[in-house]
Amino acid sequence: MTKELLVSNKLGIHARPAAMFVKVANRFSCEIFVEKDGEKVNGKSIMGLMMLAAGPGSKLKVHASGHDASQALVELETLVKRKFDEE
C-alpha cells in the first residue's frame, strides 16, 4: 500500500518530526519505506528520514506492506497532516 503525503510544517522533517514518525512507525510490524524524489529509506530509521532532506512542500510516498500496513499508513498520515504538532 502507498500513501502520498505533503510535508506542510514550517521546518520540514528535521530531528524531532523524524523521531515522531519513527516512534509511530515502530508500533507496527509491517515494513515501512518513505520515498522522496526517487530516494527510498526505511521509515523506521531517524537518520534515513533526515537524509531525505524533506523540507516544507516536499511530497513523500509512504509505502507499507504487512498485515497492519493500512493502520500504519492512517496513523502516519494523521501525524504528517497535524504538522507533527509543531504549529
Each model region followed by its residue ranges:
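Absolute protein N-terminus
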Residues: M1-K3
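C-terminal structural segments of small proteins and small subunits
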Residues: M51-E87
